[in-house]
């Protein structure tokens, strides 16, 4: 199970509350969430990580907002379940991938950021290629999940096809809107351009809508954005893999809030 960007307290508390039942209902072996917006919409803290882990999260991925809460710099150096984008500079604290030993086998999670309309980072295609060459799906590793935190749809789609047949799931994050293109690619990799956010969709991508709308209309600075506090929708994707580690089944998850549920 993969859940998209958690935005703010209301979404965080709903994920913590609902995740145990979701894991039981869907017989989930491994749960991943993107937590980069979980602290008031900006970054993540040690306490939030611990709450998510306690609720049943196995791995937390992030993105460009990771360092918005500076306390996480020390924590990430000693917590291998919390990932930062793998194409950050090599001396950056933390790791961009981890191999998890589970009862069902080894699961490799890779967190990578795109470069189109984003920060200038190392080439995500090259870095992912190196990791997949050294960790072959179905031989060295039983399942591989890649979180592509990127702005451009084209870059996410291209990365999906580039990894097709070499990963179990390639799923996009960052734009906070779930796409309707969940599919199994030609060579067996599950794919969705964006998992969407876990947050209140009566908002502007998770933020209380008054200030973002005002800024678009008036083109002037104003108050700090704050997460919307209405009923959150839990958004993500669930896959089943076969003995080769490829995707046999993929389905979107939307639960609660103003979006239609799956």
Report the location of each language-model feature.
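Acidic, metal/ion-coordinating pockets
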Residues: 1-262
């Amino acid at each position: 199970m993969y859940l998209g960007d958690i935005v703010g307290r209301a979404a965080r508390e709903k994920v913590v509350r609902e995740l145990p039942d979701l894991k039981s209902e869907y017989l989930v072996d491994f749960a991943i969430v993107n937590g980069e917006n979980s602290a008031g919409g900006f970054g993540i803290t040690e306490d939030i990580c611990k709450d998510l882990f306690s609720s049943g999260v196995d791995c937390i991925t992030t993105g460009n907002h990771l360092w918005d809460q500076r306390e996480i710099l020390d924590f990430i150096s000693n917590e291998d379940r919390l990932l930062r984008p793998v194409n950050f500079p090599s001396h950056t604290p933390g790791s961009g991938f981890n191999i998890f030993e589970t009862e069902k086998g080894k699961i490799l999670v890779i967190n990578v950021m795109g470069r189109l309309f984003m920060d200038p980072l190392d080439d995500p295609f090259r870095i992912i290629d190196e990791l997949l060459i050294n960790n072959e799906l179905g031989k060295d590793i039983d399942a591989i999940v890649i979180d592509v935190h990127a702005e451009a749809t084209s870059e996410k789609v291209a990365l999906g096809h580039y990894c097709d047949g070499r990963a179990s799931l390639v799923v996009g994050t960052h734009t906070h809107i779930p796409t309707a293109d969940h599919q199994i690619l030609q060579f067996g990799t599950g794919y969705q351009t964006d998992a969407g956010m876990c947050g209140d969709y009566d908002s502007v991508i998770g933020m209380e809508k008054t200030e973002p709308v005002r800024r678009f209309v008036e083109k002037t600075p104003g108050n700090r954005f704050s997460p919307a506090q209405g009923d959150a929708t839990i958004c993500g994707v669930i896959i089943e893999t076969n003995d080769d580690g490829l995707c046999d089944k993929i389905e979107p998850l939307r639960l609660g809030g103003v979006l239609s549920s799956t």
